[in-house]
Amino acid sequence: MARFRLLLVNEFKLFRTAIPIHLVAIFQPTVMYLLMAAILVHPTFDMYVDKSATEEGRALVAAMEEVGSPIGLPYINPILVDWDGESVSRQVIAVGEQGGALTAVQHYGLIDSNLVKNFRNRLTAAALRLWDAELGSRAVTVEESPWLPRDVPYTVYFGMALLPMTAFLAASIMGAILTAQEFEFGTIVEYTLAPASVVLVLGARLTRLVLSALISAGILLVAVGLTTGFWPGSLWRVALILLPVTVIAGCLGLLAGLLMRRSIPAFLVGLVGSFVGWILGSGFGLAAGFGKLYEAISRLTPFTHATQLLFAQYYGAGIGRPVASVFFLLVTATVMLVLTGLAYRWRVMRQG
């Protein structure tokens, strides 16, 4: 135990050999989240409406104010403006007579087709309320049946899905850099001659990587909680879910460092693996919402399984098959541990 403690202390001292990498690994995901949260889609859209003197125009604005989630925020924030009929930044609605009929014309600026769809759908929802009032018994009633008891903003999901990537990124790139540096600085010989067993050496390094990765994820978790007001139901369960993810990532970093023996290539393995896995692993939405092919591919990554397990902690509702996800994470972590042990024995003995 004393030998393991000395190895662990030495692992943390290695922070001084790659300070920029450690800072990037620990803080970059949180900084990215805070920047992205400022531009991510918000359910309430500011929609500009040209001031209308007609009763119908005022009725449309009133209907727009009624459009919203039955359990959360409104979908439209109508803003009355004096439109000159020419310049449009995003969109503006002008109510006027065309062909003898009162018409609401939605003018668009330079925006993408997805934003056009969002603006159009909100205007249609407001118009439907006007039609229903006129149609009486023939009205088309549209009811939203929420799955959850309250609306959860997308920034919560984005931050939640970023937690596995945060832990993975920190463990993988730190493990890759530290291990590759052992070869670049020639200190790998010390491990070859050391009386400590492979289990102690790898155990100390993985413990350090796991703790560092959990700290990085913890910083992001606090940032998500402070900015959204949403906190997980159980912090220790979140840590348990992320634990096998950090082990898998740490082993990937160690393998990259052992096999490549160069800092930059090993670092790129961890970096690319983290971002590709995050994108393919439900990073922007639940895998089932992107088609069967994407869902099948995403289940090959630890990110989707971790995200599905984290979902219950943030939303209070379970999705997927939790037992299968836990099994996948544990088996993958075990396989990676075995491969890392074999690679370490082969590479260190060969170096000696």
Regions found by a protein language model. Give the residues of each.
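Extracytoplasmic/periplasmic domains immediately adjacent to an N-terminal transmembrane anchor
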Residues: M1-T155
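Membrane-interfacial helix-loop-helix junctions in multi-pass membrane proteins
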Residues: L148-V152, G281-V338, W346-R347
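Transmembrane helix boundary and interhelical loop/hinge segments in multi-pass membrane proteins
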Residues: F15, S172-A194
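Transmembrane helix-loop junction
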Residues: A37-A38, I177, Q181, V224-G225, ...
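Junction motif at the cytosolic side of a transmembrane helix
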Residues: V9, F15, V41-P43, L259, ...
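Long, hydrophobic alpha-helical segments
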Residues: T155-I177
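Alpha-helical transmembrane segments and their short interhelical loops
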Residues: V198-L271, F275-W278, G320-V326, L330-G341
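Transmembrane helix segments
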Residues: Y33-T44, M260-L300
